[in-house]
């Protein structure tokens, strides 16, 4: 089993969606080989030229792309391991939470770390990243991140749904971590690896939760060094 993942200039694995899969694999006690690539390698990855995204899992000749599809596949392919995505309404709720993470956590973090993220990338990836993100945001990389010190409080406020849950329990999944935790963890790990900017206050319960997540599975998250 091979996980295809992005690396930055320091060799760090920074993709938030890949971290969802990494934590899911650890939760299930599954091991895999990691194939490191840059953004510019993605178009030529598949031997038949099929479109893939990162992360992609290759298992038994099958290529599974997209983090949600990968975790669903792991639940099906390894039924004797702890299930992560549930069934029926549980799955629908997880998909709702994934959408919230994408539109609130990831979107908010992107505007706090964008220039730092660009600087951290492989030199061969920087031009592509700049052009694609500036086209999406209709602003320069520098403009996207500018004024973050004045905007970070609004980001903190947007995390109130997480904060309220974590005031009553150590993980979003309750006493033990669940895939909901890994969905949210990926974004904060993305920021930790890509930028020295403090996106959370140390006295925030969300910060304490993130530290607990970093310690899971023998410190899997901490093995990737933080940005300096």
Where are these regions (language model features)?
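GST-like domain detector, emphasizing the conserved glutathione-binding G-site
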Residues: 1-128
């Amino acid at each position: 089993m091979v996980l295809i993942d992005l690396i930055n200039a320091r060799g760090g694995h920074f993709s938030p969606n890949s971290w969802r899969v990494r934590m899911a694999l650890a939760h299930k006690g599954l091991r895999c080989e990691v194939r490191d690539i840059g953004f510019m390698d993605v178009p030529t990855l598949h031997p038949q030229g099929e479109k893939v995204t990162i992360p992609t899992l290759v298992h038994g000749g099958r290529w599974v792309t997209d983090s949600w599809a990968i975790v669903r596949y792991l639940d099906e392919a390894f039924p004797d391991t702890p299930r992560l995505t549930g069934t029926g309404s549980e799955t629908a709720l997880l998909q709702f939470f994934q959408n919230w993470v994408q539109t609130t956590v990831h979107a908010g973090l992107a505007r706090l770390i964008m220039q730092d993220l660009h600087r951290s990338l492989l030199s061969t990836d920087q031009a592509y990243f700049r052009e694609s993100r500036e086209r999406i945001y209709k602003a320069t990389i520098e403009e996207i991140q500018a004024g973050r010190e004045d905007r970070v409080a609004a980001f903190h406020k947007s995390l109130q749904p997480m904060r309220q849950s974590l005031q009553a329990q150590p993980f979003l999944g309750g006493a033990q971590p669940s895939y909901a935790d890994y969905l949210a963890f990926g974004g904060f790990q993305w920021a930790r690896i890509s930028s020295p900017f403090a996106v959370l206050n140390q006295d925030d319960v969300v910060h304490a939760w993130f530290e607990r997540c970093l310690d899971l599975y023998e410190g899997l998250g901490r093995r990737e060094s933080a940005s300096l």
